[in-house]
Every structure is written in structure tokens, then in C-alpha cells.
């Protein structure tokens, strides 16, 4: 996956604003309509506990940030493409936000905001997020894949199953934007503030 996304960024020299704004105008309302009520309730719980909440995703920052803000979240941590004079250069700026890259990204955020990751929450449905889940004090798996569910059971992590929509449907609908994060309650990190 990393190689495919990096190749996509490296072969892209496109103006950023118009194309992404147009894409976001089409995609975000659709995504918002597909977010599970349980995921919204989890976000509300963290908000009422005065915690900052972030989507942490391999998707481009320019897509996950507006989605997070539309959900009333603090922000998003996504993969950032380097931009020069309003055009993508084809290089990454910062870590590829996948696997260990997510750990690097949340550790950086924790340093900036003086947060203790042992007091933070992370939610995921994918075993690819085991590094991120292992880096926080409160990992929660949501509609997990088989490997993640086995790991969670062995380690005593909470397992949450959302009803109605299956993981397969969520992944198919959101795969193009890599935001299963919010729809399945995954890749959301709730961080204690103050």
C-alpha cells in the first residue's frame, strides 16, 4: 500500500486547491452520511470528557482534515504531500501515515501538545494499526479484522462491534479515500487535554 501511495504522490504534479476542494465537496457529504451512529457517540464521549480528537489516516491530509472538522473533531493527521508554489512536488512531507508512520505522527503530536500517550485512546479495525494501538494506553478495536481481534483478545483490549453495516461494505465505500477510520471508529485517537 505504501509503495502505491508514494508512487502516486511521486508521479503527481498537480495544482492542489481546485481539484481537492472539488473532490471534498463531492466526497465529504457522502462520507458524513455513512458514519456509524456508534462512532459519532464515541466522538461525543471524548468531546464531553474534554479530549482532543483526531483522525489518523494514510489518506491525504487535504482530505482527512476537512472530514475531521466536519465531524467537530480537533483535526486530522494524514499523509502530507510536499507542495511548492501550489503544486505537489511528488515527494512526501513527513511520515507516510501508515503502520509505524502513524506512531511517528502521534508521537510528534504528543510532543507538540505535551500529551502523554499512556493517557490517550486509539480506535482501529485493522491489524495494520497494531503499532499505533500498542503506542497508546487505551487501545480499542472496532469491527476488527481476524488478526487484530486475536491480538486484542490475547492482550485484553476492548473489542467493539458496530451493528448494521458490515466492515466489507464500509471498506468498499470508503476505500478510495482510505477513511474507514471514522466510519468504523478506526484510526481515531482521542487525547486527554489538560
Q: Residue spans of the language-model regions?
A:
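Single conserved hydrophobic/aromatic residue that forms the stacking wall/gate
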Residues: 1-12
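Membrane-proximal helical "anchor" segments flanking the first transmembrane region
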Residues: 11-19, 175
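C-terminal cap/substrate-recognition subdomain and adjoining C-terminal extension
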Residues: 21-23, 29-194
Amino acid at each position: 500500500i505504501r509503495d502505491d501511495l508514494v508512487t502516486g504522490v511521486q508521479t503527481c504534479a498537480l495544482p492542489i486547491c481546485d481539484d481537492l476542494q472539488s473532490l471534498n465537496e463531492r466526497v465529504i457529504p457522502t462520507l458524513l452520511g455513512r458514519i456509524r451512529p456508534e462512532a459519532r457517540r464515541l466522538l461525543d464521549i471524548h468531546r464531553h470528557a474534554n479530549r482532543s480528537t483526531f483522525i489518523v489516516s494514510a489518506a491525504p491530509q487535504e482530505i482527512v482534515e476537512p472530514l475531521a472538522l466536519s465531524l467537530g473533531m480537533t483535526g486530522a493527521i494524514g499523509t502530507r504531500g510536499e507542495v511548492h508554489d501550489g503544486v505537489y512536488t511528488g515527494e512526501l512531507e513527513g511520515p507516510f501515515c501508515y503502520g509505524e508512520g502513524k506512531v511517528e505522527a502521534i508521537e510528534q503530536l504528543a510532543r507538540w501538545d505535551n500529551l502523554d500517550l499512556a493517557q490517550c485512546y486509539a480506535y482501529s479495525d485493522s491489524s495494520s494499526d497494531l503499532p499505533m494501538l500498542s503506542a497508546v494506553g487505551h487501545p480499542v478495536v472496532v469491527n476488527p479484522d481476524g488478526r487484530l481481534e486475536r491480538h486484542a483478545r490475547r492482550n485484553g483490549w476492548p473489542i467493539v462491534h458496530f451493528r448494521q453495516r458490515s466492515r466489507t461494505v464500509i471498506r468498499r465505500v470508503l476505500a478510495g479515500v482510505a477513511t474507514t477510520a471514522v466510519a468504523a471508529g478506526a484510526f481515531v485517537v482521542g487525547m486527554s487535554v489538560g
